[in-house]
């Protein structure tokens, strides 16, 4: 299992993906609360997401940022892109991530773009294949990122050198 990344020691940038107002219906009317989905990253290979709920929007965002710092993952990169094509799944969400040539930028929509930009991936192409609910898209993207392995990791797992792998 990979080691835990301490989000408090990194210089993180945060991006609010969605804010949703939810209501609890009681005898006297509706009670409103807010949920926030936030992505944090250092644009240098570390990214995480979190959710928070509170009576007021700023409190929900603060809670989401704290949660995101606890859920950080490391993103393996090759130059400015990802090492290989991968499909991330979560619930009904499915995200296809493909490496892109240098200078092509992040071709992704909404929540996926936030995750990839804050992870520090400059060139990548993506396609949403399933549900486009923001939380499912973010979780599917993180799932795809967790599946990424660079050549050194694969060589180590197989007990070979990188040169033997690449032929």
Curated annotation (Swiss-Prot):
Gene Ontology biological-process entries: translation
PROSITE patterns (alphabetical): RIBOSOMAL_S5 (PS00585), S5_DSRBD (PS50881)
Keyword ATP-binding: no
Keyword Nucleus listed: no
GO cellular component, one term: cytosolic small ribosomal subunit
GO molecular function, one term: structural constituent of ribosome
Keyword field: Ribonucleoprotein, Ribosomal protein, RNA-binding, rRNA-binding
Residue ranges annotated for the S5 DRBM domain, each copy included: 12-75
InterPro entries: Ribosomal_Su5_D2-typ_SF (IPR020568), Ribosomal_uS5 (IPR000851), Ribosomal_uS5_bac-type (IPR005712), Ribosomal_uS5_C (IPR005324), Ribosomal_uS5_N (IPR013810), Ribosomal_uS5_N_CS (IPR018192), Ribsml_uS5_D2-typ_fold_subgr (IPR014721)
Pfam families membership: Ribosomal_S5, Ribosomal_S5_C
Domain remark in the UniProt entry: The N-terminal domain interacts with the head of the 30S subunit; the C-terminal domain interacts with the body and contacts protein S4. The interaction surface between S4 and S5 is involved in control of translational fidelity.
Function statement: With S4 and S12 plays an important role in translational accuracy. Located at the back of the 30S subunit body where it stabilizes the conformation of the head with respect to the body.
Record note on quaternary structure: Part of the 30S ribosomal subunit. Contacts proteins S4 and S8.
Similarity comment text for this entry: Belongs to the universal ribosomal protein uS5 family.
PANTHER family: MITOCHONDRIAL RIBOSOMAL PROTEIN S5 (PTHR48277:SF1)
Protein name (record): Small ribosomal subunit protein uS5
Species annotation: Listeria monocytogenes serovar 1/2a (strain ATCC BAA-679 / EGD-e)
Gene: rpsE
């Amino acid at each position: 299992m990979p080691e835990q990344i301490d989000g408090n020691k990194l210089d993180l940038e945060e991006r609010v993906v969605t804010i949703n107002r939810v209501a609890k219906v009681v005898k006297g009317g509706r009670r409103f609360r807010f949920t926030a989905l936030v992505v944090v990253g250092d644009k240098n290979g570390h990214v995480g997401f979190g959710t928070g709920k509170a009576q007021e929007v700023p409190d929900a965002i603060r809670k989401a940022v704290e949660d995101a710092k606890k859920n950080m993952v490391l993103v393996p990169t090759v130059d400015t892109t990802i090492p290989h094509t991968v499909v991330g799944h979560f619930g009904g969400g499915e995200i296809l991530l493909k490496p892109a040539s240098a200078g092509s930028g992040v071709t992704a929509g909404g929540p996926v773009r936030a995750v990839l930009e804050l992870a520090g991936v400059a060139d990548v192409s993506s396609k949403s294949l399933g549900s486009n609910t923001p939380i499912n898209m973010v979780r599917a993207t993180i799932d795809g990122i967790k599946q990424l392995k660079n050549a050194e990791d694969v060589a180590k797992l197989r007990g070979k050198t990188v040169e033997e792998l690449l032929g």
